[in-house]
Amino acid sequence: MTQDYRVLLYYQYVPIEDGESFAQKHLSDCKALGLKGRILVADEGINGTVSGTVEQTNAYMSLMKNDSRFTSTIFKIDEAKQNAFKKMHVRYRPELVNLSLEDDVNPLELTGAYLDPKEFREAMLDENTVVIDARNDYEFDLGHFRGAIRPEIRSFRELPQWIRDNKEQFMEKRVLTYCTGGIRCEKFSGWLVREGFKDVGQLHGGIATYGKDPEVQGDLWYGQMYVFDSRIAVPINQKEHVIVGRDWFDGSPCERYINCGNPECNRQMLASKENEAKYLGACSHECRVHPDNRYIKAHQLSNQEVQERLALLEKDLAS
């Protein structure tokens, strides 16, 4: 059955003169088409995820292709049951992805070797290869390639320092890296080359492309792919589904992400509906008793109900 909506994921490193003005006009164009989504514009290019009807997304792709700067842009297309976003944002930023480098990497001049899904899969099976996930830790925890290294980072900009601290582990190995759609790896793989890594490859088109390849069919991917829209999780492996996510509270298999109820914390964590209720939607006791706990407010729990749940939880944890 054909779905009514689509989600488009894309990026393009290309010089954009006066990116701020471009972003303002692009927002107007997107709103005129009725699209929803989030697009970042920088002088170095564009990176976006938008959703809308088939007609709206087709019109957007035509709009982009009619601009000489974006004729080679590759759109990764997912069918969807509804819009993946509630609003339309186009924002200007100094750079598309932030590695916090004093001397930034220009992917148009320096980047790792592009590997298509089949080449990437074959390279992963080589015992002299290490695979580094270029995403954040919470993305990795939902799903990742078999044997991939999980950098202990909360954001992409922390990755270079983590590599410097751990480079002896894989300096002499062939290094592969991957991310959701490919944009982060363009810069990260180029930085690895600049740092002296001899053999660096990147998954061209990212995990999103790997999962749609008719031959590879997402093989060697465990879990689901984290996405930055209302879907949160997208299946990748067409051959088998292995759950790698673990519930924050009890370690059981889980693929349901929530944010900690304490708005000052907002930690993303995997949790079942049952555990979310049991732990009042919060990652710790301090967050559970926070006066602005969103879970308590959303469920209109009385102070008595909160105290009863806390008492039961304390008893359970003590046993």
From Swiss-Prot:
Q: Which InterPro entries match?
A: Rhodanese-like_dom (IPR001763), Rhodanese-like_dom_sf (IPR036873), Rhodanese_C (IPR022111), TrhO (IPR020936), TRHO_N (IPR040503)
Which keywords does the record carry?
Oxidoreductase, tRNA processing
What this protein catalyses is:
uridine(34) in tRNA + AH2 + O2 = 5-hydroxyuridine(34) in tRNA + A + H2O
MF terms (GO), sorted A to Z: oxidoreductase activity, acting on paired donors, with incorporation or reduction of molecular oxygen
- Record EC number: 1.14.-.-
* Superkingdom, taxonomy of origin: Bacteria
User: Where in the numbering of this chain does the Rhodanese domain appear?
Assistant: 125-219
Which biological processes are named by the entry's GO terms?
tRNA modification
Listed SUPFAM superfamilies:
Rhodanese/Cell cycle control phosphatase
Family from the record:
Belongs to the TrhO family.
Protein name from the UniProt record: tRNA uridine(34) hydroxylase
What is the protein's species of origin?
Lactococcus lactis subsp. cremoris (strain SK11)
Q: Taxonomic classification, please? A: Bacteria, Bacillati, Bacillota, Bacilli, Lactobacillales
